[in-house]
């Protein structure tokens, strides 16, 4: 468990950094995340080796980011992606990817881990927001998964 939690945290760091670079530079965040991941793997700068699950998360979020962001925009009542704290955006992207696109993670674990990251790293209101939004998507997950399967995603 601790290994996956560390992998999520590192993926969050990469997704957050890529998102911030995209905001300041105008480049698409998903491509930046994969490029940043490749850069960190190639030149680790004294960091521990990249965990396999970190790579899987970053690549998975990047591959499905358009759909993930569409779902977040649709179900985050009153919140646009741009209005969300950047850390929450990255946490939610990981959570949605784990819920809908990664069969290896139990749904409850995906939500719990996202809420734990929000509690540790974001605002006081973030855990409730993340829990509520992912909880709503969790209730819709069977239908959303069927839609993804039908669309070939």
UniProtKB/Swiss-Prot annotation:
This is Transcription antitermination protein NusB. The keyword Cytoplasm does not apply. Signal peptide: none annotated. Keywords: RNA-binding, Transcription, Transcription antitermination, Transcription regulation. It comes from the Bacteria. GO terms for cellular component: cytosol. Belongs to the NusB family. One of its GO terms (molecular function) is RNA binding. One of its GO terms (biological process) is DNA-templated transcription termination. Involved in transcription antitermination. Required for transcription of ribosomal RNA (rRNA) genes. Binds specifically to the boxA antiterminator sequence of the ribosomal RNA (rrn) operons.
């Amino acid at each position: 468990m601790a290994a996956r939690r560390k992998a999520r945290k590192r993926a969050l760091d990469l997704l957050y950094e890529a998102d911030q670079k995209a905001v300041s530079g105008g480049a698409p965040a998903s491509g930046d995340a994969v490029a940043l991941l490749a850069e960190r793997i190639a030149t680790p700068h004294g960091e521990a080796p990249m965990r396999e699950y970190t790579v899987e998360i970053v690549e998975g979020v990047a591959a499905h980011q358009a759909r993930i962001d569409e779902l977040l925009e649709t179900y985050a009542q009153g919140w646009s992606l741009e209005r969300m704290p950047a850390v929450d955006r990255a946490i939610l992207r990981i959570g949605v990817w784990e819920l809908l696109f990664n069969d290896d993670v139990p749904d409850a674990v995906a939500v719990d881990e996202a809420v734990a990251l929000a509690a540790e790293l974001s605002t006081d209101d973030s855990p409730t927001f993340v829990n509520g939004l992912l909880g709503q998507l969790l209730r819709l997950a069977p239908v959303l998964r069927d839609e993804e399967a039908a669309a070939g995603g």
